[in-house]
Every structure is written in C-alpha cells, then in structure tokens.
C-alpha cells in the first residue's frame, strides 16, 4: 500500500480560515479518490500559517480491474437499436455480446472488462480539481495570474509512494513579447501557460530555515520540517503555547486567563512558538479589566494574566514566531510600545465616558436606529424599562427593588453611545456597569446593567440577582416579541438577530433561577409596546418556538423531546418550571413497567376510539357512563377505578405533585389490562357498545389530563 502526500505552500493564511480549509481540502481529495474507485485507509490533514498538508495512507499502487455489465436490446431488435448498443458498450460486432434469458425475454448483454491502471496516473487531474474547488471566504489574484487563491500560492508538493506526481497547476498565462518596429520579425509566439509544477520540495520557517527541503515521505516531511523550525501539528503547537504561557505566568506568581478561542487563533499565527512576557503600564490599570483584556486580545493577540485572587495583573503573554539572540527583549519592548499606544486610546475614552452621566448619554440613543420597523434604540430602552418593571412585579420584588429595576433597565443601553464601546463593541453592557459603579449608582443596578445580555450562550453564566434577572429577561423578551411581530423569525440555518440564543437565554434565566412566571402574559405585555405586534398571534408563535428551543436545551441532558411535546400538548403550558416538573414526572412514569404497559393500553384505547368515532361521526368523550349497562365485572372494576382516580387526581395536580399523579395513573394498569383481556368493546348491542366506547374515552381523557399521551413515542 502506498502513501499520497500533498502540501500547498503559500503566503500566510488568515488564522481563522486554516482549520476549515484543511478539512475542506481533505474532503475534496478523499471524495475524488472514492469517486475514482481508489481505496484508502486513512487521511490526515495539518495546517500552519504557510501550508496545508494532507497525507492519505493505504492506497493501492494500481487500481482494481473493473468488470461492468451493460444490458442491451432484446434479441431480434432492429439494426438501429443494435448499433446504438454497440457504440455505447464499445463493441464492434454483436457477436461480442452475450445472450441471456431474463425471464422476460432474451436480451443482449455486454461484459466490459477494464484493467486497472497505475494509481499515479489518476492523481494529477484529481489534485488539480481538489485545489481549484477549495472554497475560501475571500480570495485574490496576484501578478497577472487568473487563478484565485486566499494568498499567493508558491509551491505544491505531491508525492505518491515516494514518486513525484506528474503535472502541475496552471495559474495563468505568460504574454508573448510585444512586436518590434520591424513588424513581427521578433515575435516570440503565442502566450504560454504559467504552471506550478508538482514536486518533492518545500521550505521551512521563513526566517529561521528558509532553505529548500527535499522530502521522500510524510515521516521524512515531518522530521525535516521540525528540523527547519516548523511544528506541523496544530494541536502540538497549541499545547506548547499553553504550557509555555502557564509556566511563564507561574514564574511571575500569576495565573493564565483561559482563552481557548485566542489559543486557537495564535496557534494559526506561528510555526515555531516562543512564549514571552510583557508588562502593562500602571497608568492604565484603572481602566476596566474587560477593556484592557479586549484591547490586548482583539488588537494584539495577547493573553491576559491574573493574580491568584482573579484580578487582572499588569502583565501579559505574547507568542513570537521565533527565538531571538536577546531572549526576546526587543520583541517584548516593541509589543509594549504598541500596547501603550492602544491603551492610551482606551484610557482617553474611559476618562471621557466617566465625565458624562449615563442618564444624559441615554438621550443620544434616539439617534441610533434599532431596526427600520422597530424604531430607535431609545424606544427599545423605553420598552425594556416598562417590561422589566412588569416582570419584577410578577416575581414579587418589593418597592425598592422595583425602582432599581426601573433605573437599571432605563440605563442598560446607554453605554452604546460611549467612546469605549465605540472602540470595543465587545464590552457593551459590561462597560455600562463599570460606569454606573463609578457614578455611584446602587451595586445591584450596576450589576444588572453589566449582566443584562447574559447568558450569551449555553455555557455562559446566568444572572441570579432578582434585579439583574428582571432586566435580562426584559431585554430578551422584547427582542423576541419585536422581531416575531415583524415576521423576522429564524428559518433553517438563518437567524440574523440571534433569536434562538435569546430564547435559550430566557429559558435558562427562568429554569435555573426557579422562577414561577407565565410567559404568555409577558409576551402580551411586550407586544403592547411594539406597533407591529398582534399580541395573541405573536404569543402563540413564540410559545411554539420556545417548545422547540426547550427540546434543544434539554436534549443534551437526555430528556426526550416527545415528553416535552406531550406536556406542551396540554395547551397553555407557559410556566417553564411547572412544565419541567411535569416532564420529569412523565419520564419516570414511562420508564416504569406499569407506565410502559399503561401507555400500550392507552394507544389501544385511542386507536379503537379513532376508528369508531370516525365511523360513527361522534366523539365519545364527555359522555356519561350508564352504570346499569356495565355487564361484566371487569368493566365495572375499570369504571370504579377511573372514578377513584379522577377524584384523587385533581388535588394532586392542583398541588403540583406530578410524581404522585403519575403513581396514581400507574394503578390503572391492572383494571385496564383486565378490561381488554375479558371485554369485547364492539358488542353487537349498539347501546352496550357505545357505553364501552365511553369507558375507553374515560381512559383516554384521564391520561390526557396529565399529558397528551398521543405524542409519546415508543
């Protein structure tokens, strides 16, 4: 078995594009191998800032022979049909075809045997196609070439079983020299193709090892690159950076602030990582830590360091792409100089922002359009203020807390017009909280402003303080109601206004804080302030949307989506905490033996009723059972059990004891099983039959009073 090694060597690939490009290239090559009938065992891709390297192992040196059968026309068909068959099958005479009786007549069959060729012969076109089809978010031309690529492509290494794959990639044409004054006597001829030939050479680190390397295999390639100061494996580079940064932090008595996203990006910026530590001038340390961290991370790709108490330290980690003779002193000094300029701007904005009260800044929100159909950001802030106070009342907050909710909601968007947020949009909300503290607003008001966007995702922290919870809920519910009102709902993968995230945020805020709040009245209250909203329609659509989001949120916890459907099927289930209590109890019920068997009996009853109700054109639900026509002991026992269950079930449901309610339903298993074993529902006597169908309807209705059992799968 042979090995295919391909390296695309180029100028620096943007770090954010590398992993996706590597996976795309692996897929394009392996898909083409499979389409060509070339088997392989495994494919592995690596990326660095200057190269995409793919190795495919376990490829046969020769392609397998192919035997193909092609059915032709019936024996005795017209000559024209026979000639068409011969041409399509590559035969010269009909005697070369076989005659077979298919049971539907005798037909001609062509047996075409194609000997497998050398695999290397199929590779040039395969590699060319994979390179040309590689998608880039952005691409460019360079020089006079027609070929587009993310950055100028310098070389293509292509080896199969140690041999260079013949051919190359045409990237453009070289124009012939212009005519001389003597006419075309010196004309060199037609334009010639510019081709990057496949070869067995690459280069190491741009500065440390710029010489050409000749390789013979993937192992040789990896080893020679390492010797030339290139660590090919991205994960290894990440681990080296992480270990080096942690060690550097520990040497300073500090702790590295975890930042997986930045680690991923920095691993795509260096081929030979060298970790260095720099300092932040003390004059900048009164700027909020989030602003400093964002500036270092976004603009400079520095890792922040913290004290053991979690406070930002005046030190940072920078990762260079090579060691230096001075131990990195010049590199650190240069980075500190650049950072000083960056943070000078941040400090200027911070000082300016502190000078103006948030209430004064709030008026400038009238100049920011939230959405062309939904008014300005000031109008949105007013909606959030009114809704947050309503939510706070629902949660039972006292008068003082209600006022703090009102202030926090009123000011939560004011930092959008600050200089710091204009420079660093990532700190919106957080910056407002810092300004509020500096301007002596109550601590829980400042915290609510800082946290009103939270949670930002499934793993983000959920606010727990009641003031913050009320404002965060109002922010998200206003967003959801407003965009649903103008029919900007998520569709498929399209969710430009992050409404799925907002709904998940509402779910987490309510569930993780155990809040007893009905969503529909809140949706209705929010809809009143949105000119385009039709309250009932928006509320119903949103509740269905929340049901879908709840399924997604709980799927990771192993909760079955059909159980959520069954509880939502009751209608009006907009108290999420109560709903989840029902779901938990229902999950325990269907997992028990009695519950599973009763579910089977429910389906049997429901199926009989569906057929008979359709046939009779009536519903048997709600009709009284004639006790005098309960002829068999089993039907009398079932009727008595249903009466007892109904009497005991209502107080359990009122007390929200859903586990007790499910336990009560489980006791119906015996009478229901006995009924189906001994009683004929469709009796010849029409009155008796109707009475028994009403008894089945009681089974269905009793269970459906706890959950819509028709939606439970399995």
Swiss-Prot record:
Subunit structure: Tetramer of two alpha and two beta subunits.
GO CC terms: cytosol
Reactions it catalyzes: tRNA(Gly) + glycine + ATP = glycyl-tRNA(Gly) + AMP + diphosphate
GO BP terms in the entry: arginyl-tRNA aminoacylation; glycyl-tRNA aminoacylation
Taxonomic lineage: Bacteria, Pseudomonadati, Pseudomonadota, Alphaproteobacteria, Rhodospirillales
Family matches, as InterPro entries: DALR_anticod-bd, Gly-tRNA-synth_bsu, Gly-tRNA-synth_heterodimer
Descriptive protein name: Glycine--tRNA ligase beta subunit
Family that this chain belongs to: Belongs to the class-II aminoacyl-tRNA synthetase family.
Compartment(s) where it occurs, according to its Swiss-Prot or TrEMBL record: Cytoplasm
Class of this enzyme: ligase
Organism whose genome encodes this protein: Rhodospirillum centenum (strain ATCC 51521 / SW)
Keywords: Aminoacyl-tRNA synthetase, ATP-binding, Cytoplasm, Ligase, Nucleotide-binding, Protein biosynthesis
GO molecular function: arginine-tRNA ligase activity; ATP binding; glycine-tRNA ligase activity
EC number: 6.1.1.14
Top-rank lineage group of the source organism: Bacteria
């Amino acid at each position: 078995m042979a090995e295919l090694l391909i390296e695309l060597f180029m100028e620096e690939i943007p770090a954010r594009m590398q992993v996706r490009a590597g996976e795309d290239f692996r897929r394009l090559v392996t898909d083409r191998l499979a389409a060509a009938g070339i088997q392989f065992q495994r494919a592995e891709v690596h990326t660095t800032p200057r190269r995409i390297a793919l190795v495919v192992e376990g490829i046969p040196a020769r392609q397998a022979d192919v035997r193909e059968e092609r059915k032709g026309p019936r024996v005795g068909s017209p000559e024209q049909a026979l000639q068409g068959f011969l041409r399509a099958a590559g035969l010269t005479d009909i005697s070369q075809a076989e005659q077979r009786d298919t049971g539907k007549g005798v037909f001609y069959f062509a047996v075409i045997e194609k000997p497998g060729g050398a695999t290397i012969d199929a590779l040039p076109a395969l590699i060319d196609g994979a390179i040309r089809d590689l998608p880039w978010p952005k691409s460019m031309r360079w020089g006079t070439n027609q070929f587009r690529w993310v950055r100028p492509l310098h070389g293509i290494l292509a080896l199969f079983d140690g041999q260079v794959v013949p051919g190359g990639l045409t990237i453009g044409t070289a124009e012939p020299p212009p005519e001389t004054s003597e006419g075309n006597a010196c004309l060199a001829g037609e334009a010639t193709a510019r081709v990057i030939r496949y070869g067995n050479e690459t280069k190491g680190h741009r500065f440390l090892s710029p010489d050409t390397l000749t390789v013979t295999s993937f192992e040789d390639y990896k080893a020679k690159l390492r010797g030339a100061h290139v660590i090919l494996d991205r994960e290894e580079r990440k681990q080296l950076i992480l270990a080096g940064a942690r060690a550097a932090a520990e040497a300073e008595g500090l702790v590295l602030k975890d930042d997986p996203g930045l680690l991923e990006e920095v691993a795509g910026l260096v081929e030979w990582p060298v970790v260095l530590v720099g300092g932040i001038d003390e004059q900048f340390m009164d700027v909020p830590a989030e602003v400093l961290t964002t500036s270092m991370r976004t603009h400079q790709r520095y890792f922040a360091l913290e004290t053991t108490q979690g406070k930002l330290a005046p030190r940072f980690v920078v990762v260079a792409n090579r060691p230096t003779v001075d131990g990195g002193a010049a590199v650190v000094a240069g980075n500190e100089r650049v950072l000083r300029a960056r943070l000078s701007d941040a400090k200027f904005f911070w000082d300016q922002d502190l000078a103006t009260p948030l209430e004064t800044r709030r008026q400038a929100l009238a100049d920011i359009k939230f959405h062309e159909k939904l008014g300005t950001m000031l109008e949105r802030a007013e909606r959030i203020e009114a809704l947050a106070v309503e939510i706070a009342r629902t949660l039972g907050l006292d008068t003082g807390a209600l006022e703090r909710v009102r202030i926090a909601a009123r000011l939560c968007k004011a930092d959008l017009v600050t200089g710091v947020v204009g420079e660093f949009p990532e700190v919106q909300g957080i910056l407002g909280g810092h300004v509020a503290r500096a301007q002596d607003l109550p601590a829980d008001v400042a915290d609510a402003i800082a946290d009103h966007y939270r949670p930002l995702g499934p793993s983000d922290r959920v606010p727990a303080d009641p003031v913050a919870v009320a404002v965060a809920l109002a922010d998200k519910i206003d967003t959801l109601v407003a965009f649903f009102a103008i029919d900007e709902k998520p569709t498929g993968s399209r969710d430009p206004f992050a409404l799925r995230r907002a709904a998940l945020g509402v779910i987490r805020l309510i569930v993780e804080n155990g809040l007893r709040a009905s969503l529909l009245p809140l949706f209705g209250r929010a809809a009143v302030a949105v000119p385009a909203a039709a309250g009932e329609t928006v509320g119903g659509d949103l509740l269905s949307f929340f049901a879908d989001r709840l399924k997604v949120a709980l799927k990771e916890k192993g909760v079955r989506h059909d159980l959520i459907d069954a509880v939502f099927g009751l209608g009006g289930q907009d108290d999420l905490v109560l709903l989840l209590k029902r779901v938990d109890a229902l999950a325990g019920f269907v997992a028990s033996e009695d519950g599973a068997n009763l579910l089977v009996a429910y389906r049997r009853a429901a199926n009989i009723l569906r057929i008979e109700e359709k046939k009779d054109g009536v519903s048997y639900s709600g009709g009284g059972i004639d006790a005098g026509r309960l002829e068999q002991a089993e039907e009398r026992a079932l009727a008595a059990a249903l009466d007892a269950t109904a009497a005991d079930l209502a107080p359990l449901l009122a007390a929200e004891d859903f586990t007790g309610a499910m336990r009560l339903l489980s006791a119906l298993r015996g009478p229901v099983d006995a009924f189906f074993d001994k009683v004929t529902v469709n009796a010849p006597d029409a009155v008796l039959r109707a009475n028994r169908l009403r008894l089945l309807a009681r089974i269905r209705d009793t269970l459906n009073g706890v959950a819509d059992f028709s939606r439970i799968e399995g």
